[in-house]
Amino acid sequence: LDEAEAEWHTAIARLQELPLADTDILIQEAYRAGKRILAEGAQGTMLDIDFGTYPFVTSSTTTAAGACTGLGLAPNRIGEVIGIFKAYCTRVGSGPFPTELDDELGEKIRQIGREFGSTTGRPRRTGWLDLVALKYAVEVNGVTQLMRMKADVLSGLDSLEVCTSYRYRGEEVDHLPYRLDAQLLEPVYQSLPGWSEDLTGVRKTTDLPDT
């Protein structure tokens, strides 16, 4: 206990050494000086307090608009919005997940992709890529560049499924319904060929498999 308490006091002392500043002033000064400013968001669009799958959301703004409210930066000063998405979908905790894989394949993706909460260690739910939700995220955030990650996790699968639309109340829709009721929502999939190559060390798009 004494050792843990000593470590705690050491950590507090380190925090007290850090300089305090009005970050909005620093940001404005950097902007006026023509410096490049990079803001990184945490959590996904579907957890946003306003545009997420309420009530299964977080308590803050997780969209690109959060850069404005969090930094004190005016919306018209944002240049590029880079959207980052996984080659498959994940979610922690409760909430709608139309493409969820609650089976051995889902567990395989979880283990290979190390899909566990960074703080709590809770297993993340996994599923096929949902292009309907991705399209929604692109529109809400005003994404100008889109980057995919973790495609290497899916190496070795004979085929992949990608959700391109939903069947909702007897109709096929290509947008997120107002109410994401799992009982009423059925994903429509398109099958794509998989690949066997190991993509771990790939750095160029020309080295990716033809799929």
Name these PLM-found stretches.
Residues 1-211:
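Non-transmembrane, aqueous-exposed alpha-helical and coiled segments at domain scale
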